[in-house]
């Protein structure tokens, strides 16, 4: 009986942790999207116009955010919703030979800026993803994208760091220090960006 009571107490504690985590995972994105809805709509329109002009999405980030760059790219190239058009997108984090080659002699991580200088066209979209906006190579790549005339979109967390002060066309900062909630919110955000870009494509007169 004593063991059963102890297990029950442990279960209650675990349930409390689960509930707290869920509440945080709901409250932060709810506040973020309530505040940023207008800017998100503007970003979607700007992205849709670039795609309409023949542009591509070029996404990049480090670590777990490197896989987010791949995730958002595949969403555009291979839409999960039947009937939505495929749009050109590329994650700069995909090619291991290029990444390892560029990393040699680089003290600041993978120089995404070099890839943009070689691959990007002025009508393209650069999307940089970072947990705190402080990833030097991501911020430098966005600066290179600005120099080249790309539409620049940054996704960050915390206070946004240097990314938030870089004068990007759009910078969306999830104001929490919890990296899990930041990533969850970023994922929802780029799903929304994908969906609304297609809404604008369904009303192409708005893109002229």
Q: For each predicted feature, which ranges?
A:
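Generic N-terminal amphipathic, Lys/Arg-enriched alpha-helix
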Residues: 1-34
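Glycine-rich, small/polar surface segments that engage phosphate groups of diverse ligands
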Residues: 45-120
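Short glycine/serine/threonine-rich phosphate/pyrophosphate-binding segments
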Residues: 65-70, 134-141
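Short beta->alpha connector loops at strand-helix junctions that form conserved
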Residues: 93, 130, 156, 172-180
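A charged, well-structured terminal subsegment
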Residues: 118, 180-208
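Surface-exposed amphipathic alpha-helices with a cationic face
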Residues: 142-146
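Short, glycine/polar-rich helix-capping loops at beta-to-alpha or helix-loop-helix junctions
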Residues: 155-170
């Amino acid at each position: 009986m004593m063991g059963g009571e102890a297990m029950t107490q442990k279960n209650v504690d675990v349930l409390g942790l689960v509930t707290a985590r869920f509440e945080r995972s709901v409250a932060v994105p709810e506040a973020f999207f309530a505040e940023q809805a207008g800017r998100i709509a503007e970003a979607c329109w700007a992205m849709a116009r670039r795609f309409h002009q023949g542009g591509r999405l070029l996404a990049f980030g480090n670590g777990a955010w490197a896989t987010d760059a791949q995730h958002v790219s595949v969403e555009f190239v291979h839409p999960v919703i039947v009937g939505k058009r495929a749009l050109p997108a590329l994650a700069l984090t995909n090619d291991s030979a290029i990444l390892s080659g560029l990393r040699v002699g680089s003290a600041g991580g993978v120089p995404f800026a070099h890839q943009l200088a070689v691959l990007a066209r002025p009508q393209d979209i650069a999307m940089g993803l970072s947990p705190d906006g402080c990833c030097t190579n991501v911020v430098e790549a966005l600066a290179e994208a600005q120099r080249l005339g790309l539409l620049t979109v940054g996704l960050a967390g915390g206070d946004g760091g240097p990314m938030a002060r870089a004068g990007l066309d759009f910078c969306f900062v999830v104001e929490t220090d919890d990296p899990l909630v930041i990533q969850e919110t970023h994922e929802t955000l780029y799903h929304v960006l994908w969906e609304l870009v297609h809404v604008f494509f369904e009303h192409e007169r708005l893109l002229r």
